[in-house]
Amino acid sequence: MSNHKEFSEALKVIPGGVDSPVRAFKNVGSEPFMVQKGKGAYIYDIEGNKYLDFVQSWGPLIFGHADKDIQDAVIKTAKSGLSFGASSPLETKLAKLILSKFDWLDKIRFVSSGTEATMSAIRLARGFSGKDKIIKFEGCYHGHSDSLLVKAGSGATTFGSSSSAGVPEDTAKNTYLAIYNDIDSVKNIVEKEDIGTIIIEPIAGNMGLVPADKEFLIKLRKICDEKKIVLILDEVMSGFRAGELGSYGIYGIKGDIVTFGKVIGGGMNVAAFAGKKEIMDMISPLGPVYQAGTLSGNPVSMAAGIASLTKIFASRNLYTKLENLANMFMIGLKNIAKNHGIAIQVAVRGSMFGYFFTDKAVKNYNDALSADTKMFAKFHSGMIKEGIFLAPSQFETGFICDAMSEKEINFALKKANKVFDEISKDSAKKANKTKICSKKTVKKSVKNKK
């Protein structure tokens, strides 16, 4: 069956044909391919086409597709049962592995998705602080729970309004919007409102890759300390991706609560939130903050997470290799674009990378919105045709995996050069056509005057 036909069938029974909106490729104006399998750095569609994959399931697959060690752990555990609805030693083992890297985090609880992790972290922070009002930052995505699906109101100091149908305005009104990398926007809100919680992606990966400035995070931490505000660092994406210590290894900033996901599950549905003992002990059954989940901590997912982190901790120079490849890709892409007269900004944090077609530095959501999305769509479509799978949205992040080498990066850059060549030629043709049409219009106008 063809990609088109299979997607057409999906459209009949699944809203939009997908189970997560970005997979529909609407942001780049094309139709998605349907995946048959993945192996290492590559995925294959149902037509047999092969793609070098820089999406890597949106981050979890740091060792690439179908990693043998992780697969073996999953298969072995699955033979004993998929889920028990009771605790197993695997939960404790994975908890200890994660906490061993963060000496200020005392306890952790597992859930099944990043949305659950941030939603639970917000509830926990509110329960601990006794305050309902929170601050989030424009462009930071923390899952699709109601209180976090907000957009800016009439200004940075106003409360948010819902950005999705079905979210009550009263729910959104307890969420205030600040500007990423702008500490004054935070101060303006904190001075006027009784804020109990601030949540942030220290390395924003959902408006494209936009890292926080270190000085901004230092000042944010200081405000939280002075005002006794609970600071949640959302590291669902950046945890064990930007480095073994996530954002902490880069900035040295400690969150009161930290959320994890993606890599800690090795490709299975695992996320978590962790914090200091006095905060975490507020969760039931110890405290009054309720949180539960049927499949939370299921043994198969725990086994995948243990295998993933064990392999990470045993891999010497893993993150150095991944960051070198990410820099090689982004620096190369920037140089190629420059040679074609195309404005581009690039960013790298560990194995994460992003690019914007703009000549302006991207520091926040408004900067990201000003980038040339039409150029992005052209580039993405061209790369797909050349067998390179990049995130099908300007507002997503790309990922390097351990199965890649300089060979794959050079291949991707070679294809990028070809795509930019075609874009430049197409632009030149259109410009020439416009010029000819303009001359004809002028001649016709002169003739009519005579």
From Swiss-Prot:
It comes from the Bacteria. InterPro entries: 4pyrrol_synth_GluAld_NH2Trfase, Aminotrans_3, Aminotrans_3_PPA_site, PyrdxlP-dep_Trfase, PyrdxlP-dep_Trfase_major, PyrdxlP-dep_Trfase_small. The keyword Cytoplasm applies. GO terms for molecular function: glutamate-1-semialdehyde 2,1-aminomutase activity; pyridoxal phosphate binding; transaminase activity. One of its GO terms (cellular component) is cytoplasm. It holds the Pfam family Aminotran_3. It is an enzyme of class 5 (isomerase). Its cofactor is pyridoxal 5'-phosphate. It catalyses: (S)-4-amino-5-oxopentanoate = 5-aminolevulinate. Keywords: Cytoplasm, Isomerase, Porphyrin biosynthesis, Pyridoxal phosphate. Its EC number is 5.4.3.8. It is found in: Cytoplasm. The modification N6-(pyridoxal phosphate)lysine is found at K262. CDD domains: OAT_like. The keyword Cytoplasm applies. One of its GO terms (biological process) is protoporphyrinogen IX biosynthetic process. Pathway: Porphyrin-containing compound metabolism; protoporphyrin-IX biosynthesis; 5-aminolevulinate from L-glutamyl-tRNA(Glu): step 2/2. PROSITE patterns: AA_TRANSFER_CLASS_3. PANTHER family: GLUTAMATE-1-SEMIALDEHYDE 2,1-AMINOMUTASE, GLUTAMATE-1-SEMIALDEHYDE 2,1-AMINOMUTASE 1, CHLOROPLASTIC-RELATED. Homodimer. Belongs to the class-III pyridoxal-phosphate-dependent aminotransferase family. HemL subfamily. This is Glutamate-1-semialdehyde 2,1-aminomutase. The gene is hemL.
